[in-house]
Amino acid sequence: MSKNLLIELGLEELPAYVVTPSEKQLGERLATFLTENRLSFEDIQTFSTPRRLAVRVSGLADQQTDLTEDFKGPAKKIALDADGNFSKAAQGFVRGKGLTTDAIEFREVKGEEYVYVTKHEAGKPAKEVLLGVTEVLSAMTFPVSMHWANNSFEYIRPVHTLTVLLNDEALELDFLDIHSGRVSRGHRFLGTETTITSADSYEADLRSQCVIVDAKERQEMIVEQIKTLEVEQGVQVDIDEDLLNEVLNLVEFPTAFMGNFEAKYLDVPEEVLVTSMKNHQRYFVVRDQAGHLMPNFVSVRNGNDQAIENVIKGNEKVLVARLEDGEFFWREDQKLQIADLVAKLTNVTFHEKIGSLAEHMDRTRVIAASLAKEANLSAEEVTAVDRAAQIYKFDLLTGMVGEFDELQGIMGEKYALLAGEDAAVATAIREHYLPDAAGGALPETKVGVVLALADKLDTLLSFFSVGLIPSGSNDPYALRRATQGIVRILDHFGWRIPMDKLVDSLYDLSFDSLTYTNKADVMNFIRARVDKMMGKAAPKDIREAILASSTFVVPEMLAVAEALVKASHTENYKPAVESLSRAFNLAEKADASVQVDPSLFENEQENTLFAAIQGLTLAGSAAQQLEQVFALSPVINDFFDNTMVMAEDQALKNNRVAILSDLVSKAKTIAAFNQLNTK
């Protein structure tokens, strides 16, 4: 007869960003625990609030399934001594399995007999197995952890309660400094300690204590309440998904309300207002039906609507203090001169091992000028790139960015326009930070693209040059994000400059402030980012084949990955790759000084293959180029079928290997085909 299991871990307030992944982790770890312990179940449902993580298992078997396992031991000739008695090796083997030699039988495997024993283990009651469920809680991993009281252990937050119920029976367990029971805590202000009656009554028991344990239900409540406010007030609310996910993990019983602020603050740039509300106060932004910002906000209270007017006033007061700061900085920053701010950047440290921000900008300016030539920018765009590179970090010293660092670049654009800078320069100041997150928006203008690349390239090379190279998951200077940004920009804009040549050209530059070093490490790091981008769809062998190609042009590499993945599902993929792989492997024996001499050809197949290689232009898209190379497969096979490549005559051998080397030199611009797996 199946049962339902409930586990709830009651904790001190969790950071909002930890709640959802921890809820998911708990469910996954418990499912693994039950499976490994042979306890079948029908379904798992997880719950979470800022003060609890919980999971309920439905249809849990009341007993483990019985286990029957066969174990292979030593060969019979080792298991028996000269008198036919079991040797110490055989005795030790069965002893290790908890059995005696009576359990031994011999089975033939590939012509030889071996010792085998079969072990039968009766399933234990679920209640007994579940005593080990604290292993699941102990194995939980978190981005942060802490000690409390005088305990030697640490956890994400102090644990207050542990409830483990099998139907309505409370199991007694010890975890950290807590003994389990059936007591849970209600809402911090609206509830009290309460008893969980059974696994099935969990939601209802806590709902009576003003706690909605189902995160999805809380989210639906918040959205529904916001929609009601929209209808009542005739407005639109920006329900930002990230903010919604954060807010639902800040509350156990949500109540949405609308507050107001003076319309005068709408004269401050919208980005400042939105940042103040969304990022700092966790408020939702309100707009009119035309999409214009309104002097209102929506917030979500952790509680009911009791004394809601006081709550609204308190939230309005806090927001106004933020908006006052924004208005003040907006007004005062406009009195500053860009040239003065740029001059002060010589005193701002980029990194103590690398130098000042001004020196970083100087290097970026030189790199940007080089990139502008490669990108064939117009004279006006080249001028804009140069000007932007001279000033693009000035806003870091403004009061606004000092208070709201999320607005770096955004305020730089606005202040630059107010100061009379060209629009292309101002836009590039904002765009050079892009992309600012995985999958984030990319710069859209050529000037912005060049400045973004130059800034990221110097950042990457500078940190690597002083030995600050990411290792493992440790990347304090966000160099992976910067490099991923470089790769994404190059791919999106189809910039076909070879990455190795680009990096080589940067290492040829000379600066008084820094000498670039560790080029090999830089290239490997960039390759790893390209590999990651390909890894979204391409298997390992395809990625390795492309990374081993003779071309390092990012857009082409990603296009080839897509083309190879599609081709791998076709009938001619395997034979084409196998013939090319054979050519690649033989070409490794080529003498680079030997050129193909057609006068040494002894059969038509040599001539046909050589002519086909000479006519191979590899034009068009990656898929078309791949098709052209694959089309040579019959010609290559015909060549191998009728030609002894490794001939005894050294001249013939060298000439035939040279033919294959010519083929490989062209095909390898696409991929190292001998790295591909056709099994």
UniProtKB/Swiss-Prot annotation:
Broad class of enzyme this protein falls into: ligase
Primary subcellular site in the record, as a coarse category: cytoplasm
Homology family: Belongs to the class-II aminoacyl-tRNA synthetase family.
Pfam families recorded: tRNA_synt_2f (PF02092)
Protein EC: 6.1.1.14
GO cellular component: cytosol
Localization in the cell: Cytoplasm
Catalytic activity, as annotated: tRNA(Gly) + glycine + ATP = glycyl-tRNA(Gly) + AMP + diphosphate
Record note on quaternary structure: Tetramer of two alpha and two beta subunits.
Keyword field contains Aminoacyl-tRNA synthetase: yes
Keywords recorded for this protein, A-Z: Aminoacyl-tRNA synthetase, ATP-binding, Cytoplasm, Ligase, Nucleotide-binding, Protein biosynthesis
Protein name per the record: Glycine--tRNA ligase beta subunit
Organism: Streptococcus pyogenes serotype M12 (strain MGAS9429)
Gene Ontology biological-process entries: glycyl-tRNA aminoacylation
Gene Ontology molecular-function annotations: ATP binding; glycine-tRNA ligase activity
